[in-house]
A protein has these predicted regions:
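Active-site-proximal segment of tyrosine recombinases
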Residues: 23, 128, 138-141, 145-162
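Residue-level marker of regulatory loop/turn positions in helix-turn-helix DNA-binding domains and
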Residues: 1-2, 12, 122, 126, ...
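Alpha-helix N-cap/helix-start motif at helix boundaries, enriched for small hydrophobics
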Residues: 9-10, 21-26, 157
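Catalytic-site neighborhood detector that most strongly recognizes the C-terminal catalytic loop/helix
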Residues: 161-183
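Active-site/catalytic core of tyrosine-dependent DNA strand-transfer enzymes
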Residues: 58-125, 131, 137, 142
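Short, cationic motifs built from Arg/Lys/His that form the positively charged side of catalytic pockets
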Residues: 5, 18-19, 46, 51, ...
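Conserved tyrosine-mediated DNA breakage-rejoining catalytic core shared by Y-recombinases
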Residues: 25-68
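Basic, Lys/Arg- and aromatic-enriched nucleic-acid-binding interface segment
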Residues: 1-16, 20
Length: 183
């Protein structure tokens, strides 16, 4: 398929739960700063909100690998990872990634994925999407946080996603609504 932008987007959206537009706005300087500070800062998320994602060892290793990759290709700190510019480049990159997903998802998507049901979780969508990677990130982060500290799990996941209500985070976790389940 030959699309390095797609590989980069997959890696970062899966590892950090970024929205596709946040990925398209990510600059090399954000990665360099994350290595110094231990947090990836998303300065302009949904609704203009800033959020910080504390790096775990796997995320740190991913950033190290990509900083080396981009520096070897001559990117400067202020350069976008996959977009050409702020004005039109972010929109163009986002549209290009969305189109790629639309035309290629059948090549790597599990057949009949909407029929795979995990106990305690909602039914999956029939197709995958970039936003679906964000759901996967949420579920992995939540499971890891549960191991660490049950009480902090919801807070950690909600903060990393840039949401302040657990009700919204529950959607990403594919949890059934406890009120509906009781009925």
């Amino acid at each position: 398929m030959g699309r390095t932008d797609v590989v980069i987007a997959f890696d970062f959206i899966d590892a950090f739960g970024l929205r596709i537009e946040e990925m398209c706005r990510t600059k090399l300087e954000y990665l360099m700063s994350a290595l110094k500070n231990g947090q990836l800062v998303i300065p302009k998320g949904k609704g203009g909100q800033k959020r910080n994602i504390t790096l775990d060892p796997t995320q740190r290793a991913l950033i190290v690998r990509y900083v080396e990759y981009f520096q070897a290709r001559g990117l400067r700190p202020g350069d976008y990872l996959i977009s050409s510019s702020e004005k039109h480049g972010v929109w163009d990159a986002k549209r290009s990634l969305q189109n790629w997903m639309s035309y290629n998802r059948e090549k790597f998507m599990v057949k009949d994925r909407d029929k795979i049901v995990e106990e305690g979780k909602k039914k999956r969508h029939a197709t995958i999407s970039w936003h679906g990677l964000r759901h996967g990130y949420t579920q992995k982060t939540h499971a890891d946080a549960l191991i660490e500290n049950l009480k902090q799990a919801k807070k950690i996941v909600s903060e990393n996603l840039g949401h302040h209500r657990y009700k919204v985070t529950r959607i990403y976790l594919a949890e059934e609504n406890p009120k509906k389940k009781a009925q």
